[in-house]
Swiss-Prot record:
Known partners and oligomeric status: Homotetramer. Forms an RuvA(8)-RuvB(12)-Holliday junction (HJ) complex. HJ DNA is sandwiched between 2 RuvA tetramers; dsDNA enters through RuvA and exits via RuvB. An RuvB hexamer assembles on each DNA strand where it exits the tetramer. Each RuvB hexamer is contacted by two RuvA subunits (via domain III) on 2 adjacent RuvB subunits; this complex drives branch migration. In the full resolvosome a probable DNA-RuvA(4)-RuvB(12)-RuvC(2) complex forms which resolves the HJ.
Name used for this protein in its record: Holliday junction branch migration complex subunit RuvA
Designated gene of the protein: ruvA
Keyword Cytoplasm in record: yes
One of the GO BP terms on file: DNA repair
Annotated Gene3D superfamilies: 5' to 3' exonuclease, C-terminal subdomain, DNA helicase RuvA subunit, C-terminal domain, Nucleic acid-binding proteins
Taxonomic classification: Bacteria, Bacillati, Bacillota, Bacilli, Bacillales
Family: Belongs to the RuvA family.
Spans annotated as Domain I: 1-63
């Protein structure tokens, strides 16, 4: 159900995007909503998965079928919920996660929020041999020149996105200082830089 949603990308938030189609705005939870920033106000196709809970029906969206499949594999693991799976995919490509699983790299997996040693081991036990490494994932970025005011906004929005993924304000304090020393061409780029810092 809801294999994908195709329509105009109207809004970006730290945890989700809104896609309007046939007069209806669909709220879609994504690993890194700012990945779609360059498509704002344009038509997009987002691969989706609907998860029904007792208190809500949530639509999760991804930039590729590979990312969606990795998400669906991760949430089958005991101890991994949608939020943890999104946090993993916000930082890593599907192939990077698959390599960590195949190489039994528990240390890599414990870098993500909410993933302890026990859960990392469970991911490996449940998914090793079941995930296939595909051709390299591609994620293009729109390169634009940004003003200093835009730079501040990029960093602020990146911090909100990182906090939404489950990282604490204490963990992010040093990250924010480092981000402010550099220049970024988009929120997505700042988020990726922040994610690399927080898991390093």
């Amino acid at each position: 159900m809801y294999a994908y949603v195709k329509g105009k990308l109207t809004h970006l938030y730290p945890t989700h995007v809104v896609v309007e189609t046939a007069g209806v705005g669909y709220e879609i939870q994504t690993p890194n909503s700012y990945r779609f920033q360059k498509h704002l106000d344009h038509e997009v196709l987002i691969h989706t998965s609907l998860i029904v809970r007792e208190d809500a029906q949530l639509l999760y969206g991804f930039s590729s079928e590979e990312e969606k499949d990795m998400f669906l594999s991760l949430i089958k693991v005991t101890g991994i919920g949608p939020k943890s799976a999104l946090a993993i995919l916000a930082t890593s490509t599907p192939n990077e996660v698959k390599r960590a699983i195949e190489n039994e790299n528990d240390t890599y997996l414990t870098k993500f929020p909410g993933i302890g040693k026990k859960t990392a081991r469970q991911i490996v036990l449940d998914l090793k041999g079941k995930v296939k490494i595909t051709e390299e994932d591609s994620d293009s970025l729109l390169q634009v020149d940004a003003t200093s005011t835009e730079q501040d906004q990029f960093v602020q929005e990146a911090m909100l996105a990182l906090e939404a993924l489950g990282y604490s304000k204490r963990e992010l304090a040093k990250v924010e200082k480092t981000l402010n020393k550099n220049k970024y061409d988009s929120v997505d780029e700042a988020v990726k830089a922040g994610l690399q810092l927080v898991v390093s």
